[in-house]
Amino acid sequence: MSLFKKDISKKELEKAFNEIQMNLENNYIDLAIKAYKDADLMLNNYHKESKIDEKTYTKFKARLDIFAKRMEGYSHRLNVKY
């Protein structure tokens, strides 16, 4: 695995996390939920395919958990967990 590919993966993850942050700040509930799910899927795929190392995975997973905590109860429906 080249260092260049890992940098690209990190940049793509940063972009996905920035999208979540932007949607949360603008109170776009549906878009924030979709961006969260997409980022979670991307993070897990990159980890499974060894495109990111364990340290990077742990760092991004912690950030994703913070977003999950902030998004508790985000829905147009009641009592929905993500």
Regions found by a protein language model. Name each.
Residues 37-60:
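Short, charge-rich amphipathic alpha-helical segments embedded
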Residues 19, 23, 42-49, 70, ...:
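Amphipathic, soluble alpha-helical interaction motifs
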Residues 10, 14-17, 33-40, 61-64, ...:
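Generic structural concept
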Residues 60-82:
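Alpha-helical linker/edge segments of TPR/alpha-solenoid repeat scaffolds
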Residues 2-33, 76:
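N-terminal acidic leader/helix
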Residues 1-2, 82:
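Helical anchoring/docking segments at protein termini
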Residues 8, 27, 31, 52-55, ...:
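A structural signal for alpha-helical segments
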